[in-house]
Amino acid sequence: MGKAQPLPILITGGGRRIGLALAWHFINQKQPVIVSYRTHYPAIDGLIKAGAQCIQADFSTNDGVMAFADEVLKSTHGLRAILHNASAWMAEKLGAPLADVLACMMQIHVNTPYLLNHALERLLRGHGHAASDIIHFTDYVVERGSDKHIAYAASKAALDNMTRSFARKLAPEVKVNSIAPSLILFNEHDDAEYRQQALNKSLMKTAPGEKEVIDLVDYLLTSCFVTGRSFPLDGGRHLR
């Protein structure tokens, strides 16, 4: 008998930056992937050509989240992992209704992973001890808070807390952990002054790039023991 096809890894927000890098990492390992995307960036066409299943999703409403879950349930009988990478960034600023800012941040960072974890739970179970994973991408601000992004920080803190709750609920079949990054890579339009200011916030004074995240994700996926933990990727920023 031939070797069984590996179960797919689901990556939310996989059309750009870290999500896209993770998708290509797994594709290059012959690991099937399912990617959600909100905006059809050119990179999505490359993923589709490489064999990834890419599903456009609107996580701004609970109905949109559940519609995406239904598409995943139709497409596979199981999942190797869910990587909750989809994110949004809103600040409290003049003219923006505060209730709308909070609702938006909670919707993408709390409602979406909460609903998907429940809706797709049966796809993660039944594959053996510690055979499946959920990884939440939180943020360094969970530890420090943020005076300019209060709703964002609060929503990521809620996601961090859900890591421990889902770890309790889904063990020992499913490991649930979170990754809390600070600066990993710059945007193309970031100028030299901003880049230097950002680098100076950490002890290591570098933006390590996607590989740092990929290596940690690989560690969590291959561990048979680690669950309910948050892993900072901040270059010692908490010591500055």
UniProtKB/Swiss-Prot annotation:
* Entry superkingdom: Bacteria
Return the SUPFAM superfamilies for the record: NAD(P)-binding Rossmann-fold domains (SSF51735)
- What does the record give as the reaction this protein catalyses? (6S)-5,6,7,8-tetrahydrofolate + NADP(+) = 7,8-dihydrofolate + NADPH + H(+); 7,8-dihydromonapterin + NADPH + H(+) = 5,6,7,8-tetrahydromonapterin + NADP(+)
Q: Which UniProt keywords apply?
A: NADP, One-carbon metabolism, Oxidoreductase
EC number(s) recorded for this UniProt protein: 1.5.1.50, 1.5.1.3
Q: What class of enzyme is it?
A: oxidoreductase
Q: GO molecular function of the protein, one example? A: dihydrofolate reductase activity
Keyword match GTP-binding: no
Q: Where is the active site?
A: Y152 (proton acceptor)
Which biological process annotations from GO are given for this protein? Answer: one-carbon metabolic process
Task: Relate the protein's function as given in its record.
Answer: Catalyzes the reduction of dihydromonapterin to tetrahydromonapterin. Also has lower activity with dihydrofolate.
Q: Which family does it belong to?
A: Belongs to the short-chain dehydrogenases/reductases (SDR) family. FolM subfamily.
**NCBIfam families tied to this protein:** PRK06483.1 (NF005066)
User: What is this protein identified as?
Assistant: Dihydromonapterin reductase
The protein's gene is named folM
